[in-house]
């Protein structure tokens, strides 16, 4: 009987071990497939970019900046973004601003960052205003001004940029206007993505603490769960502590 038990246990261990190996093999294979697809995409975009395709140049700049599916290369990001910016591509101008703002591959230069973001906004880039707002809110290279930050975030919000909407919500929360902050947080609607995650988490916080709304563990839990589905680890921690 004991012998049969030992054999059965060994079989289970073997099956479990094989399962883990197969999972690792599948994950490795998926990573290789994604990498190959991205390499093919970069090759195609590079061919177009070298022929003067401005959109291809801007997209290459963004891919190398974000490191999506490949290793980030800030030097190449700047190179391609500058080529596109020379031809009035406003997304490229914004990405140049990010490189200077964060000091990615270049020395931090808030003046150049602000100038690049301003150019992108002048051209109608929807995401550019959020960065001007962030710089104004935190006094990065410009005089710290919540009024200016609000102004820029409102431009972004009116262009449909949810990050600007979230930033506006946080500004109103700072001054105790919770009703207004909730209005902006709820612009996430039923989206489930990383942009919406902090908005759901913020709503969960307000309901958990009864700020601007009647305290409701049920509502807080629902918003934290949405935030978790959208990729927030912090919301997971808050949900565990929720009483």
Task: Give the positions of each predicted feature.
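C-terminal motif of bacterial Sec signal peptides marking the signal peptidase cleavage site
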Residues: 15-17
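Terminal, low-structured helical/coil segments at or just beyond the last alpha-helical repeat
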Residues: 202, 211-243
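Bacterial signal peptide processing site
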Residues: 19-21
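Short helix-capping/linker turns of helical repeat alpha-solenoids
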Residues: 50-53, 66-68, 86-89, 102-104, ...
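Hydrophobic face of amphipathic alpha-helices that form TPR/SEL1-like repeat modules
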Residues: 59-66, 70, 95-102, 130-138, ...
